[in-house]
Amino acid sequence: MQKRCGWVKMNNPLYIAYHDEEWGRPLHDDQALFELLCLETYQAGLSWETVLNKRQAFREAFHDYHLQGVADMTDEELEALLDNPAIIRNRAKIFATRANAQAFLQVQAEFGSFDTYLWSFVEGKTINNDVPDYSQAPAKTTLSETLSKDLKKRGFKFTGPVAVLSYLQAAGLVNDHENDCEWKSRNE
C-alpha cells in the first residue's frame, strides 16, 4: 500500500487523486494557478473536501476560469450564481472571484505572467520542508505573510496568510508532503 500524507481522506477518490496528481507539484500555468487560487479562497471556513466535491460546478459557473471571462462577469451574473446549489453560495467569495481575476490580469500585465510574479517569492525554486507530521506544520509562515500582504495590496480578496500558505503548498512552491509520503521526493 502506498504511503500518503496523513491528511488525505482515503474514503474519497477525489481527495486521493488531488493528493497524488496535483498537490505539491510545481505549477506554472497561469490559468491553473488562477483556478487554484479561487479554490483556496472558496475554502475559507470550510473543508477542502467540500471544495473538491464542487470543483467541476465552479468551473462551469466561472467560464472554466478563463481570466478575461471571469474578470468581465457582471454583477447580475454573479448574483445569479447565488441561486446555484452546486457551488458554495457565499456572496463575498463569488464576488471575490471576479475581483481576483481583475487583480490577476494586472499582475500579468506588470510581470508578464502571474507565474513569474508568484515564483519570484521563492527565487524560482520549491522550498522543501521537513514535515514529520502534517498536523504539526504551521498554519502560516513568514513567506505566506509576505505574499499575503502583497496580494492584498494588489487588490486580491480572501488571501490571508493561512489561505496563501495552503496555495503555496498546493501549487508546489512549498513542498510540505510528510517525510514518509511517497510523493515527497516526486515533488523535490
Say what each PLM segment does:
Residues 1-188:
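HhH-family (HhH-GPD) DNA N-glycosylase catalytic core used in base-excision repair
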